[in-house]
Amino acid sequence: MNTKSKKELKRLDAVVISDTHLGTRSCKAKELLAYLKSVQPNHLILNGDIIDIWQFSKSYFPKAQLKVVRQIIKMMEQGTKVQYVVGNHDEALRRFVGTTVGNFSIVNKVVLDINGAKSWIFHGDAFDVVMQHSKWLAKLGATGYALLTIINKIVNVFLSLFGKMRISLSRDIKRMVKSKRDDITTKFEKTVAELAIKKRYKYAICGHIHWPAKKFIENDHGKVMYLNSGDWVENLTALEFENNDWDLVYFNEEDSFLTDEDLVDDADQMLVSDKLLFQTMFQDVLSD
């Protein structure tokens, strides 16, 4: 295995990522790890659905996903301020909103003021009608989406064996219903934009809908730059604040780097049993 030569870290004012869905088979942890190891932001905003508590299984947490967590901790130790914005898939963390430990805090939103430009950052589920009135339907949809990604992986294995290109079933389905999805997204965007304009923010940043975007939205009272950080399930996108503006970036392996130690096979997973967890806790209690 060839090891890529390390490149200089990209120094940024801020980075926003969302919808990583750690703890599920949908998460593209290796790519996310590579991206995080390529940047050095002053602020890292984890904009919701970072850990997928809805679908989390204690028997499944791949090493690659564990390394993502370790990398975020390492970034905090090196001075990056990390703010965890709670989403719907990790809503159990809402009871801890307001908690701050060192460079880490759990919040419902972030208002980031860089050089006088205010960014209003929140997950976006607050403006999701399904989440407000039919949470069971949202959870059912999440389960179906997870099942689809598993089927997708199996299909891609067979396609690879026959030398065919990989496909994304969920992306194809989105294209089939593009007009309907565009209507839903537009309503979501307009709601966010109207409030942002009213509050006089320059930028409004969400996640939640797995639909990366950067666009101006106007109404009779003004305009705002609407951004969506996308996800790390299909789109592999992030938002970077540099040179007094936000950029929507797509993961490119050539712009990142991994060492041999970081490269982890998707099938290489860490099975965490209750017994192992108890033993670890017991050792921690007894250690100096």
Q: What positions do the PLM features span?
A:
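Core catalytic region of metal-dependent phosphoesterases/phosphodiesterases
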Residues: 5-13, 22-114
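Active-site-proximal beta-strand elements of phosphoester/diester hydrolases
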Residues: 13-21, 118-125, 225-230
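Conserved beta-sheet core of the metallophosphoesterase superfamily
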Residues: 102-109, 125, 129-139, 182, ...
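Binuclear metal-dependent phosphoesterase catalytic core
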Residues: 112-115, 217-288
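Active-site glycine-centered loops adjacent to acidic/histidine catalytic or metal-binding residues
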Residues: 19, 48-49, 87, 123, ...
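Hydrophobic/aromatic beta-strand patches that form the interior of the parallel beta-sheet core
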Residues: 15, 45, 83-85, 120, ...
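Non-catalytic terminal accessory segments
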Residues: 106, 115, 169-202, 211-212, ...
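Active-site-proximal loop/helix segment associated with metal-binding centers of metalloenzymes
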Residues: 124-188
